């Protein structure tokens, strides 16, 4: 009888929560969310460590693991994010002793702990009692199809809007956070793990979408107009007429669904952040680990408003593919979310991948160089995933610092060397502030909308093959060009109020935008800013409807041209006369707009008997600034040359652009107020470079460095020069 009453009370609580969630589903995520003003984020040195899962170990070795971490020099671990079934092995029965002993052991060794809320992998009893929690995943085909029902056995298989799931998650979070609130070893909380929408299309998700549309558009008639639903006679007369996402053909519907999916993720993490703050200590920070950046269904910038500090999991190429570019892209974006420092919660320890088909252990020196790469972009913490390789299951070959034998190895020796250096120079590296004069405008709406109407697909007409190039590849290309040119960059967003902090704004394929954003870009140019913009910009409005005006719509005056036609390119074309002197890189592909200059100057023309009458690249002086427009998709080499030309005109080039190709440099100001200059050699060959800044000290060896001195960089090595006299004893032990 008591168990029945307990179960009945639980069901009543869930029913009450369901009513509350249904009401809340009608509201969008809050416009703003405040991060804690009390969390202690004044790190005195770099946090360096690993994820640790004692529960995975084949035998009892906690003391040995902690001793090895301490000997290696680690000062932080991240734990607990995958362990709901251990915290709560049965409904309502909580156990803490298994984690208490691990936290206590870390504390005695002076190793700090970040605990994760273990909500991304549900226990078996929950799936059994509430099968409705499992996701019904979106099944998008040309002619629609029912959602695909998830089953138990994989992580991230739940509907995070489910009232039952929210009930159990809240109960668990409150228990765990309150338990460790006053534990001095626990310094922060990670919300969930690599959260996304999981493509959930459950009934409650769809009902929430209906309520969201009703609030946003007001009436079905307004929605019909915005989405152009008279097409194919698909207009609706009541909100109940709205079709489910699976079969919807409307580009407006598809775009709005992606926004709704993003808002669901934001709401979920804001909800968790509020719960954690209610029960935690003000000294404990709140973060979440983004599973990389620039996702289609995660609004990273909105989520960041609820965090004390963002965190990101960054994986990258190794061996001959280790060049720092992946870290640069991910971490420029992460730093831009709050214009602040960030944490790296996961990065390569040894090999990665879910199979044994992609096993490339880093060369000697690459693990060490990788740590400093993260720090040079503003990371205050670097943690490996993970401490010890797992003996079975999905991530058997995603190796940790220790291999499956759990013994010291080459990776352990290299991270120990790195930790020894960080113990000496960490206070000089933490809290690095980076000032960029170039920004890239990132539009998640354009990413998604171009995905619905791709400009470069494999196969022929009606094949609907995968894209061979898209918005993401274009953004990556343009960022990579800046990286290769040793230009630091930030990311800005469609919500950015103005762009005046930057001398050069790069706008890749801004396919979706409202008129207000177009005006802000035009005003930026008029007031002296420089813009490099690409094809498809200004074409469609915020509802993914093409504007009823000559392209590029509101940008026409600032761009100085218009166009009425465009064409796919079946094969790459050259530009007449190789105007940017790039030799075999003088190629464009995929897409060509027939630009008709009105005030703009033609910079380059297609070398083609028909298309050759229209320029491929134009530049327009508008007010005090310029707008350079690429009407086609440039080759990588050509893109780099075009951006270099724009940087020169904006006065943003100097000695950094004269460095050898394998050498990359990063600059910033540390918490001591001194300028730092990181020089990286991403190659297996020794390189000599000329140091171009004020005299200082190489923090890694303590030796003075004069202006114009030659720096010798060994293979996969670096130098870190701090300007002026150093304040700590830095000579190597």
Language-model segments: which ranges?
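The substrate-binding groove and active-site-proximal loops of carbohydrate-active enzymes
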Residues: 48-57, 82-97, 151-170, 192-199, ...
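Conserved, mostly hydrophobic/aromatic
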Residues: 50, 69, 77, 106, ...
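Short, acidic/polar
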Residues: 56-71, 171, 175, 292-303, ...
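Aromatic-lined substrate-binding rim segments of carbohydrate-active enzymes
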Residues: 63-72, 76-143, 174-177, 272-280, ...
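Bacterial N-terminal signal peptides
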Residues: 10-19
């Amino acid at each position: 009888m008591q168990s029945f009453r307990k179960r009945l009370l639980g069901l009543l609580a869930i029913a009450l929560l369901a009513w509350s969630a249904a009401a809340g589903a009608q509201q969008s995520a809050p416009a703003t969310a405040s991060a804690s003003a009390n969390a202690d984020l004044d790190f005195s040195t770099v946090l360096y460590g690993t994820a640790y899962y004692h529960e995975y170990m084949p035998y009892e070795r906690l003391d040995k693991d902690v001793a090895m971490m301490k000997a290696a020099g680690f000062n932080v671990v991240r734990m607990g994010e995958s362990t709901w079934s251990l915290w709560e092995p049965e409904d309502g029965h909580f156990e803490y002793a298994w984690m208490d002993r691990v936290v206590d052991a870390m504390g005695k060794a002076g190793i700090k702990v970040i605990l994760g809320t273990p909500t991304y992998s549900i226990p078996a009893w929950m799936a059994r009692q509430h099968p409705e929690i499992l996701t019904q995943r979106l099944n998008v085909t040309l002619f629609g199809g029912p959602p695909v029902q998830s089953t138990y056995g994989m992580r991230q298989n739940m509907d995070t809007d489910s009232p039952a799931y929210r009930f159990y998650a809240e109960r668990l979070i409150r228990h765990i956070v309150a338990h460790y609130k006053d534990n001095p070893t626990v310094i922060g909380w990670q919300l969930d793990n690599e959260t996304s929408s999981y493509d959930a299309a459950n009934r409650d998700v769809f009902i929430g979408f209906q309520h969201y549309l009703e609030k946003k558009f007001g009436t079905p008639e307004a929605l019909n107009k915005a989405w152009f639903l008279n097409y194919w006679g698909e207009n609706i007369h009541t909100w109940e007429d709205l079709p489910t996402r699976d079969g919807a053909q409307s580009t407006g519907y598809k775009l709005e669904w992606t926004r709704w999916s993003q808002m669901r993720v934001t709401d979920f993490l804001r909800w968790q952040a509020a719960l954690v703050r209610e029960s935690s200590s003000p000294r404990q920070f709140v973060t979440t680990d983004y599973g990389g950046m620039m996702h289609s269904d995660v609004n990273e910038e909105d989520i960041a408003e609820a965090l004390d500090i963002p965190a990101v999991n960054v994986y990258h190429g190794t061996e001959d593919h280790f060049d720092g570019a992946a870290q640069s892209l991910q971490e420029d974006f992460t730093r831009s979310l709050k214009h602040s420092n960030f944490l790296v919660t996961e990065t390569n320890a040894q090999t990665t991948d879910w199979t044994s088909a992609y096993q490339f252990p880093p060369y000697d020196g690459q693990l060490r160089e990788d740590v400093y790469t993260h720090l040079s972009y503003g990371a205050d913490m670097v943690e490996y995933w993970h401490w010890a390789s797992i003996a079975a299951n999905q991530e058997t070959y995603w190796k940790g610092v220790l291999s499956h034998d759990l013994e010291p190895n080459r990776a352990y020796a290299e991270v120990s060397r790195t930790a020894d250096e960080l113990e000496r120079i960490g206070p000089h590296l933490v809290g690095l502030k980076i000032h960029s004069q170039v920004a890239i405008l990132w539009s998640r709406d354009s990413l998604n909308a171009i995905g619905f109407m791709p400009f470069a697909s494999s196969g022929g007409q009606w094949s609907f093959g995968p894209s061979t190039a898209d918005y993401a590849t274009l953004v990556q290309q343009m960022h990579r060009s800046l990286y290769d040119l040793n230009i630091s960059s930030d990311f800005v967003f469609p919500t950015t109020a103005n762009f005046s902090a930057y001398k050069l704004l790069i706008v890749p394929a801004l396919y979706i935008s409202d008129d207000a954003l177009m005006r802000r870009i035009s005003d930026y140019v008029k007031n002296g800013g420089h813009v490099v913009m690409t094809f498809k910009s200004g074409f469609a409005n915020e509802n993914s409807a093409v504007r009823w005006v000559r392209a590029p719509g509101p940008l026409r005056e600032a761009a100085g041209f218009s166009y009425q036609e465009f064409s796919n390119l079946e094969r790459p074309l050259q530009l007449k006369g190789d105007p940017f002197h790039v030799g075999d890189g003088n190629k464009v592909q995929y897409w060509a707009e027939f630009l008709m200059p009105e005030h703009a100057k033609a910079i380059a023309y297609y070398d083609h008997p028909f298309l050759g009458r229209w320029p491929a690249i134009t530049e327009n002086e508008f007010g005090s600034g310029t707008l350079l427009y690429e009407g086609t998709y440039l080759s990588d080499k050509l893109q780099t040359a075009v951006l270099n030309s724009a940087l020169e005109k904006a006065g943003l080039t100097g000695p950094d652009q004269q460095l050898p190709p394998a050498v990359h440099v990063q600059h910033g100001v540390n918490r001591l107020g001194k300028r730092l200059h990181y020089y990286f050699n991403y190659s297996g060959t020794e390189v000599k470079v000329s140091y171009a800044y004020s005299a200082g000290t190489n923090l890694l060896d303590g030796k003075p460095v004069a202006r114009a001195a030659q720096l010798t960089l060994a293979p996969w090595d670096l130098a870190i020069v701090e300007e002026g006299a150093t304040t700590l004893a830095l000579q190597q032990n």
